[in-house]
Curated annotation (Swiss-Prot):
Keywords: Aminoacyl-tRNA synthetase, ATP-binding, Cytoplasm, Ligase, Metal-binding, Nucleotide-binding, Protein biosynthesis, RNA-binding, tRNA-binding, Zinc
Protein name: Alanine--tRNA ligase
Binding site for Zn(2+): 577, 581, 680, 684
The organism's place on the tree of life at top rank: Bacteria
Lineage: Bacteria, Bacillati, Actinomycetota, Actinomycetes, Micrococcales
Length: 892
């Protein structure tokens, strides 16, 4: 049974059971605490946790998910994949355990002809929470599965909670017995390779408090509304129904594996055991199949490669796939062959991967091209680092390996492999330590950005008192009541001068950072206190949290206050936000509708706008964007906002941020009607002339297939232009030319500088050649081998010595000859030895001689028999090292 048919049967079955079919949400989660949608229940969390009223009592979905926590296991097991589809059915206070169990058993065991999956009931095993006698009895009563195939497990395996106070409940999991060929008998408790989990039923029925860990908490009572949350792994079921060994061989992934095998000329054999000689290649092909599909789906949902967040995950997936292909022997660009194979396998379920393939492929191919350049430049840097480490006689440092990874994007496994080929070890422990340190810094930074508290219970308690009403569209100052004060993640009764707090009001004119617009700042005052608002965030939907510091007095958790936004700063932010919409419209007008928004940020006087585009913008194009934007500002276009249904907004052509999740009702911002029409919750000027002017700073790449423009607006734009005018004036004075001739004069000066550098390089080479000619006459016989041993003194670097040694070797002719030249560069001695073929036949090996000399110099080195390089720390022993080389040749 094909994957498309599996998902269709799922939806049809539950729709027939009274469920509403809900389309998959984007892989880009609307939950700010998640990078991606990681489970089928994520879009339903507000309903399952009773934060929002669900629009239906029963729902079903097939949700796209991404998880990369076990990325290193991909390809090695039958079950680990980064992209997967979770089939789910949900009940919000409607049916509970019995119907959930009956539905699951019915769908799994009903014959294929009657719309089910046709699994033999005798191959099904079930686990229940060890204390959930009710679930076991319901399985026995409704399915006929015997008691010996129902096993009990503890909280770690069969109890669901968020890890925070709130809803929780026991689980029941359904397993499929793959047969004795896959492991020992005894059910899931004995072997989860043979018995593979396919469906998890969560019975959300309890309220928990005092959470000490995921398995240590207090159950304080039953929920007034009991919910059902289930998830079936579509790929796992497909694996069973299609009779294949693992999820990678199902119909949505196998075509990519086959293409990888074709490109590499290797055979895919389904090898599972590391002892199998085909295992390594098969794992690499499975990695390619998995990662290419994940990359396809992420780009389709609006993610672009970058060095942080979601973009970094995408970049890593693409680069791991390309790296796996290189290890399979394919060094050319391979995504133009692999990505279409994945598109064709997925388009039946997700038509967007075909209709939007031009954009998807442009981004993916550009990322592969960039990575291939990275490998080329990283290889050169690695070779330098290897040479330096060899010269010093030490392993390649963890710092060097980390720099290659962090700066060049050079994979550590490639560093290890190439260093091993060069006969050099790598301080892998040092590299791992630096990687851990970087992750810890990133986690700390992310924690700070999200308010510093992973525990949202204090906010959820405050939300229980009511949502924060935002009044800032209509007023910048108003009366309000304090709903609560949070300090250190806990609610407090009051705060005094100097305390840093998070303040929640019943209503507020302060705009919370969202949609790319920075938060308002200002003052909250009352009887005897002054609080300065530094930032405003929404840690959970419906709650505005003012991050503030008490400047005077003491504020209580039920105080009456006056909230006043910094008007000048808000106006400057509104100038920037409306300016962002204008730039977006200008880009569409000049580049076309494919220049879609990928992100934005605006604050007082400044805007940044990221958009989909595959190449840099010319100076003329940038000038045109700036001109169109300023004409719109000068035309005094009216800016209007309207609230309407999402369908109506789309019908009007309102632009939305790709991959963003919107509610059923949206806010639309229009500039001169249809000239610019976007979904936006931010604040704006009332007409474009209030922006004053807009000055582009330039544009740059921000990842494959994406560009960024930056601009100043209003007074900041004037200041920017004034600074540029002053710079031009300074340059004209310095170079003694009119401003119109500046570019020509600077270009001429740079050309002269390049010519001078070229001449210096020519003279240096001539000096080396002259030195080589003079040194030929200094050759001495050492047991039948002519030897030139020369101390060059201070040198520019190892390249100078290499060029001198090779020139000398050529000048000495075919007679057995060896050249040893040494010098000091950056206070460290360097030695280079070159031998000709006759000398090598006479037993003279450059690598062995360099190790001898470098040992005397207090370091190490290595190389081949014909050319080798070394170095050390004791520059005072250069003469001794050269003498030792000559003696060794004479005594060989």
């Amino acid at each position: 049974m094909k994957s498309q048919e599996i998902t269709k049967r799922w939806v049809d079955f539950f729709v027939n059971k009274g469920h509403t079919a809900v389309p998959s949400a984007s892989l880009v989660s609307s939950d700010p605490s998640l990078l991606f949608t990681v489970a089928g229940m994520v879009p339903f969390i507000p309903y399952l946790t009773a934060r929002e009223e669900p629009p239906y009592s029963r729902a079903t979905s097939v949700q796209k998910c991404i998880r990369t926590g076990d990325i290193e296991e991909v390809g090695k097991t039958a079950r680990h994949g980064t992209f997967f589809q979770m089939c789910g059915n949900f009940s919000f206070g409607d049916y509970f355990k019995e119907d959930a169990i009956k539905f699951a058993f019915e769908l799994l065991t009903t014959s294929v002809d009657d719309g089910g999956y046709g699994l033999p009931a005798e191959r099904l095993w079930v686990t229940v929470y060890e204390e959930d006698d009710e679930a076991k009895e319901l399985w026995l009563k409704n399915t006929g599965i015997p008691a010996e195939r129902i096993q009990r497990m503890g909280k770690a395996d069969n109890y669901w909670s968020t890890g925070q106070p709130g809803p929780a409940g026991p689980c029941s999991e359904i397993y499929y017995d793959r047969g004795p060929a896959y492991g020992i008998e005894g059910g899931p408790l004995a072997d989860e390779t043979r018995y593979i989990e396919i469906w998890n039923l969560v019975f959300m029925q309890y309220q928990i408090e005092n959470v000490r860990s995921k398995v240590d908490f207090d159950i304080v009572g039953e929920l007034p509304q009991k919910n059902i949350d289930t998830g079936l792994g579509m790929e796992r079921l497909a694996m069973i129904l299609q009779g294949v060994e693992n999820m990678y061989e199902t119909d949505q992934v196998r075509p990519v594996i086959d293409k990888a095998a074709e490109l590499s000329g290797r055979e895919y054999t389904s090898a599972e055991s590391p002892e199998d000689p085909h295992h390594t290649d098969d794992v690499r092909m499975r990695v390619v199949g998995d990662h290419i599909r994940s990359a396809l789906m992420l780009i389709a949902d609006g993610v672009a490669p970058s060095n942080e967040g979601r973009g970094y995950v995408l970049r890593r997936l693409i680069r791991r796939a390309v790296r796996a292909m290189r290890l399979l022997g394919v060094e050319k660009a391979c995504l133009p062959d692999l990505l279409p194979a994945s598109r064709d396998a997925m388009k039946g379920v997700y038509p967007v991967v075909e209709t939007d393939f031009a954009r998807i492929s442009r981004i993916a191919y550009a990322e592969e091209k960039a990575f291939l350049r990275t490998i080329a430049s990283g290889t050169a840097r690695l070779e330098d680092a290897v040479a330096e480490s060899k010269a010093a006689g030490v392993p390649l440092s963890g710092a060097d390996a980390f720099a290659l990874h962090d700066t060049y994007g050079f994979p550590i496994d490639l560093t290890l492999e190439m260093a091993e080929e060069a006969g050099l070890q790598v301080d892998e422990a040092g590299f791992r330590a630096l990687m851990l340190e970087q992750r810890q810094r990133a986690q700390a930074d992310a924690k700070g950005k999200k308010g510093g508290h992973a525990d949202l219970s204090a906010y959820q308690e405050l939300l229980g008192k009511g949502e924060t009403v935002f009044t800032g569209y209509d007023e910048l100052e108003g009366e309000a009541k304090v709903r609560g004060i949070v300090s250190g993640g806990r609610a407090v009764a009051h705060a005094s001068t100097g305390d840093e707090i998070e303040l929640v009001l019943n209503e507020t004119p302060f705009y919370a950072e969202a949609g790319g617009q920075s938060a308002d700042t200002g003052l909250i005052t009352g009887d005897g206190f002054v609080v300065e608002v530094l930032d405003v965030q929404r840690p959970i939907k419906g709650l505005s949290v003012h991050k503030a510091i008490v400047r005077e007095g003491e504020i209580g958790s039920d105080a009456l206050v006056r909230a006043a936004v910094d008007r000048e700063r808000r106006h400057a932010a509104e100038q920037a936000h409306t300016g962002t919409h204008i730039v977006h419209a200008a880009l569409h007008q000049i580049l076309g509708p494919e220049a879609t928004q990928r992100g934005s940020y605006n604050k007082a006087g400044y805007l940044r706008f990221d958009f989909a585009w595959g190449e840099g913008l010319s100076t003329a194009t940038r000038s045109e964007i700036e001109e169109v934007s300023n004409i719109a500002i000068r035309n005094n276009f009216r800016v209007d906002t309207k609230v309407m249904g999402l369908a109506e907004a789309k019908a009007l052509g309102a632009m939305a941020l790709f991959g963003e999740n919107y509610g059923s009702e949206v806010r639309v911002v229009e500039i001169d009607g249809a000239w610019s029409r976007e979904l936006c919750g931010g604040t704006h000027v009332s007409n474009t002339s209030l922006i004053g002017s807009l000055s582009l700073l330039g544009e740059q790449s921000v990842g494959s297939g994406n560009r960024r423009v930056e601009a100043f607006v209003g007074l900041d734009a004037f200041r920017h232009l004034a600074a540029e005018r002053a710079l031009v004036s300074e340059l004209t004075e310095l170079l003694k030319v009119p401003s119109g001739q500046l570019a020509d004069r600077i270009s001429s000066t740079l050309n002269k500088l390049k010519a001078t550098e070229k001449e210096l390089d020519r003279l240096r080479k001539e000096q080396l050649a002259a030195a080589a000619a003079n040194l030929v006459g200094t050759a001495k016989d050492a047991a039948g081998v002519r030897v030139v041993a020369h101390d060059a003194g201070q040198v520019g670097g190892a390249d100078d010595l290499r060029n001198l040694a090779l020139d000398l070797r050529n000048r000495l002719g075919s007679e057995a000859s060896t050249v040893a030249v040494a010098g000091v560069s950056n206070d460290r001695p360097v030695i280079l030895i070159a031998t000709n073929e006759a000398a090598r036949e006479a037993g003279v090996k450059a690598g062995a001689l360099v190790r001898l000399a470098a040992g005397i110099l207090g370091g190490g080195g290595g190389g081949k028999d014909d050319v080798a390089q070394g170095g050390g720390t004791d520059a005072g022993k250069v003469s001794e090292a050269l003498t030792a080389v000559v003696d060794a040749i004479a005594k060989r």
